[in-house]
Amino acid sequence: MHRGLYPGRFQPFHIGHLEVVKWSMKHVDELIIVIGSAQESHTLSNPFTAGERIEMIRRTLDKENLDLSKVYIIPIPDIMMNSVWVSHIKTFAPNFDVIISRNPLVNRLFKEANVEVLQPPPFDRHKYNSTLIRRYIIEGNEEWKKLVPKSVLDYLLEIHGDERLRSIAGL
């Protein structure tokens, strides 16, 4: 059994994230999606709760007909010590044998812990970028709606996530 771990904050889950999940599921038997900064919400950088992010991801994967029996979604709170971060992840996640990431620090930490690193293609990272999407939402730029899966768009509108983000920004 080849099990991969894909960490991210997913604030919000966008089309680039979805493409990484699809790519990953072609390379591993099971996928653990780790929702980082799980304790954070209602801030400019982390506007959505861990539960809301789980909901975004599950709805999207279900809509895409991806086999949810092969996917774990695990929220993990931050720890502010890079030297023990991999051990922290291993405490919360099921066993895995490969990390799926393009983040240089994440890759370095897992390599040092003797975990294989798989780097997915970039999938237009300048376009599909959660920071940009949050900025578009705050500015009222409707382009953000094209950068997230339809299920995420519907969910964010359902929970008034766009209004929340503008309110947090003081608008």
UniProtKB/Swiss-Prot annotation:
GO cellular component terms, semicolon-separated: cytoplasm
Principal subcellular localisation of the protein: cytoplasm
Alphabetical list of Pfam families matching this protein: CTP_transf_like
EC class of the enzyme, as a word: transferase
HAMAP family named among the record's database cross-references: NMN_adenylyltr
PANTHER family (alphabetical): BIFUNCTIONAL NMN ADENYLYLTRANSFERASE_NUDIX HYDROLASE, PHOSPHOPANTETHEINE ADENYLYLTRANSFERASE
Protein name: Nicotinamide-nucleotide adenylyltransferase 2
